[in-house]
Amino acid sequence: MNQVLTETRPIRLKGRSFLAMVLSPELPLDGWLERLDDLARRSSGFFLGRPVVLDMENLAIERAQLVYLLQALNDRGVWIMGVEGARPSLLGPGMPPAMRGGQPAADFEAPAGEPQANPGAPEPQISQAVRAPGHAVHAMPSMVITEPVRSGQSVYFPEGDVTIVGSVASGAEVVAGGSIHIYGTLRGRALAGTAGNTSARIFCRKLEAELVAIDGLYKTAEDLEPRFRGQAVQLWLDGDYMMIDTLS
């Protein structure tokens, strides 16, 4: 009887890095969840399809509270791919795995409360918010997109600047480690300086944005002065302030 021998093909395992958002909950959890709801309300679909890591490093809670938090996030459509900094006793079957070795980048924070703007204040418009510190990155490469970014599409380029020759539709997103240049209307979301670049800027021919962010400082449509909507503008950071001015 003949025996046919076949060579077993090995399973290929590869290491690969991916960009994920890190959420850092604070006590009391219900108050933090309310602020998260506010961010989601201000920018619809912000967490849709986005991988998220839960940072437990400075959060002293019990397992029952963690189960409650994970369920609350799941109910809000926030998918937790892993948990960082949690005690081993907190995690178990059916829960996200422990994550280690994450490399820091610009932090993601919900917009902070701010005072009402003075109608008589001179331009450029300044709005105060809290910004997490990052490490400046220089001499970045660039990416050029020669067509519009349609609703539901995302452009990720954490290595440097992104230029869009066209518009960014509502529900679309552009994420860049450096600056973002949009030669059209910005209706979706633009997140610049995500590699910790405090000198990053956002430029667009027409501002109708759902959300803009530079180095972790976020502003939603409700936070932006109405007089800048529909205008050609640039946005940048000056310390802990996001500044906006029209382009001549």
UniProtKB/Swiss-Prot annotation:
Signal peptide (residue range) = none
Pfam family, any one: MinC_C
Q: Which domain of life is it from?
A: Bacteria
Does the keyword section mention Cell cycle? Answer: yes
The record, for InterPro entries, names: CAP/MinC_C, MinC, MinC_C_sf, Septum_form_inhib_MinC_C
Alphabetized Gene3D superfamilies for the sequence = 2.160.20.70, 3.30.70.260
Q: Where is this region: Disordered?
A: 94-125
The protein's UniProt keywords, in alphabetical order, are: Cell cycle, Cell division, Septation
GO terms (BP aspect): cell morphogenesis; division septum assembly; regulation of cell septum assembly
Q: How does it assemble?
A: Interacts with MinD and FtsZ.
Q: Which family does it belong to?
A: Belongs to the MinC family.
Function in brief: Cell division inhibitor that blocks the formation of polar Z ring septums. Rapidly oscillates between the poles of the cell to destabilize FtsZ filaments that have formed before they mature into polar Z rings. Prevents FtsZ polymerization.
NCBIfam families reported in the protein's UniProt record: minC
User: What name is this protein filed under?
Assistant: Probable septum site-determining protein MinC
Task: State the species of origin.
Answer: Brucella abortus (strain S19)
Supply the source organism's classification. Bacteria, Pseudomonadati, Pseudomonadota, Alphaproteobacteria, Hyphomicrobiales
